[in-house]
Amino acid sequence: MQKTKKGQLGFTLIEIISVLVILGILAAVAVPKYYDLQKEAADKAASAVAAEAIARYNMKFSKELLGGGKTCSDALNAAKIEAFGNDRDAADYGTDWKVTYEGSKVTATNEAIGGTYTIDFEEPLCD
């Protein structure tokens, strides 16, 4: 039977290695989840920007058609410029956002955060 010195406290090597292995496993599980959350947040932000572009379009179209005394095609053109323009700059939708309208799709993209979202959208028809 061996006597231990008084005040000699500490962890054994096996205990330290066990803790490091457990931390490694937790990190291996948590890090991918974190990146998935970042991608999901970026896509949700892109979804909100695309929806905002469509809302701007609809508001401008309604305002021009109902209150501006313009024809339907003039109101459509004004709404396109308001919501999409030729190449919207970052100040209109926040930092680094690009909103495009092609065919029947509105796409919001932000390369800095990696978010992209596309919404199907059809313009009102003019008679």
Identify the residue ranges that each predicted region occupies.
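Short, low-complexity interaction segments enriched in Ser/Thr/Pro/Gly
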Residues: 2-3, 30, 77
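N-terminal leader/signal peptides at the extreme start of proteins
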Residues: 1-11
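Alpha-helical hydrophobic helix detector
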Residues: 17-33
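Extracellular/periplasmic head regions of type IV pilus-like filament subunits
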Residues: 62-115
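Low-complexity, S/T/G/P-rich flexible repeat/linker segments used as non-globular hinges
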Residues: 111-127
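Membrane-proximal N-terminal amphipathic helix
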Residues: 41-68
